[in-house]
Amino acid sequence: MGESIHGLERSHKCTELSSSNIGEKVTVMGWVQKQRNLGSLVFIDLRDRTGIVQLVFTDKDGEMFDKAKTIRSEYVIATVGTVAARSAEAVNKKMATGEIEIIASELRILSSSETPPMYIEENSDVNEQTRLKYRFLDLRRPDMQRNLILRHRVAKVARDYYDQNGFLEIETPILIKSTPEGARDYLVPSRVHPGKFFALPQSPQLYKQLLMVSGYDRYFQIAKCFRDEDLRADRQPEFTQIDIEMSFVNVDDVLEVNEGFVKKAFKEALGVDVETPFTRMPYAEAMERFGSDKPDIRFGMELVNMSDLVANCGFKVFTDAVAMGGSVRAINAKGCAKFSRKEIDALVDLVKTYKAKGMAWISISQENEIKSSFAKFMSEDEMKAILNRAQAEAGDLICFVADKNNVVFDALGQLRLEIARKLDILNPDEFKFLWVTEFPLFEYDEEDQRWAAKHHPFTSPMDEDLQYLDTDPGRVRAKAYDMVLNGVELGGGSIRIHIQELQAKMFKMLGFTEEDANRKFGFLLEAFKYGTPPHGGMAFGLDRLVMLMAKRNSIRDVIAFPKVQNASCPMSNAPDVVDETQIEELHISIAKE
């Protein structure tokens, strides 16, 4: 049994104490980081959310001294004592409280602890599975606490900023109608309505649009969202987004308001000045220059189109790609001619994982000796033209991919990032934002042989492209935009369709029958009959934003209790079986495997 806290009141958190408190009687409480027994003295490092302060117990204290000797790491204690200056040789400049210590006069052990399965310290070298199984211990570590405090600060900035800009925080339902948005819905069976199901929202999309129809003008919400999909480093089955919608706006209005939030968040939470307005880049330009719709613009190494130079050369791989309507493009990896054949082969293997058939290359040594995987098929003039366009110099490695455009862009876009990582030129302290705009409204689904929405069915076409809706859907651009930071999509949105007839037409183009559209979205189409303002908005992934601000590699590091790769929780063992009576009440049965 632990001792009672009765009669004690904490006067300070650990790092609220400094040399200005010397001579004061204080009461501190927290966890024992470590205990050191030096015979006539016992030192205890006491830890709370703010940091560590040193407690001192002497053998003159009798019973209290004996009690201090029994204390182990992670015991929870309360101590009353007097703040004193450390001796000059004992000052620890690495600690916020390194100039002081507390000479204890009272000690209570509030609860004891077993030996923890992991060290509770900064950057503890422990595998992630153990960290997640004992997440309640992992969250005691200073780096994890900093991450969650940063998350809190960003969320607070969001609430303050959007409130100051006339937005209302309105909660939308968690139990909704299933209208899958590309990923699978999490379904919730209804006990009251046998055979029917709610879904957990993938986003508040329809409800925030209905709030605009309802006249609320500016809405925001820090919303929980759910997607039943395979996980990656930046995906979770449940995630949090900062959700925004605005009435009577155009694209510029939405971008300006939301980059203002990001600027304020970085300044207030990190002390970092973010330059605004952000760079804006149409989707087509992003693909042409970087091979990606979320380019990392901290470095160059842009794609170069070589198609016209090689259309009639002797290298069949190049000529065939151009003849079938594809392209031949390259990147110049400056200073990479020193790559070994093994390293180049690894780059070839990389592009193959993105459906490229291979990678051609030219290397130029410091002595200007040219080596190439295809030089024997090229004339001297053709090779010279290629090198000129690539702005090649001694020491460079030029990497080529020839294929359909989408394969070329994807492969070279990923190759560009891999080479940047190998060269260690990605500065984690540099934050390069941009907006990617004018996305295609549709993308063609080869498997289903039909057009699908690039973003979602509620995105408005650009006015000047409406004429192509019936005749050339692939040419239609959307009033859509993504915010990108250092190659990571932070969020996205669009101006929405607000005309009922156009929304119905969009559903039809996407393959919905009138009956199906009405069953899934009838309440939205009905609302659009009663005066709908032009509106648009976006959503930020709060998890991703904080992950980048905290310079972490996984959003699991900025979520208190995340799921793992198979969408389970090692700590609580969720999901788990439930009682048979619960299953029966829901009027469902579990199929045998």
Curated annotation (Swiss-Prot):
Q: Which GO terms describe its molecular function?
A: aspartate-tRNA ligase activity; ATP binding; catalytic activity, acting on a protein; nucleic acid binding; transferase activity
Q: Which is a Pfam family this sequence falls into?
A: tRNA_anti-codon
Key word Nucleotide-binding present in the record? yes
> Which InterPro entries does the entry mention?
Aa-tRNA-synt_II, aa-tRNA-synth_II, aa-tRNA-synth_II/BPL/LPL, Asp-tRNA-ligase_1, Asp-tRNA-ligase_1_N, Asp/Asn-tRNA-synth_IIb, AspRS_core, GAD-like_sf
Give the Enzyme Commission number. 6.1.1.12
Residue sites binding L-aspartate per the record:
181, 227, 455, 496
Query: Which reaction does this chain catalyze?
Result: tRNA(Asp) + L-aspartate + ATP = L-aspartyl-tRNA(Asp) + AMP + diphosphate
Q: Which UniProt keywords apply?
A: Aminoacyl-tRNA synthetase, ATP-binding, Cytoplasm, Ligase, Nucleotide-binding, Protein biosynthesis
Look up the domain of life of the source. Bacteria
The cellular location(s) given in this protein's UniProt record come to: Cytoplasm
* Binding, ATP: 227-229, 236, 489, 541-544
The subunit structure is: Homodimer.
- Protein name per UniProt: Aspartate--tRNA ligase
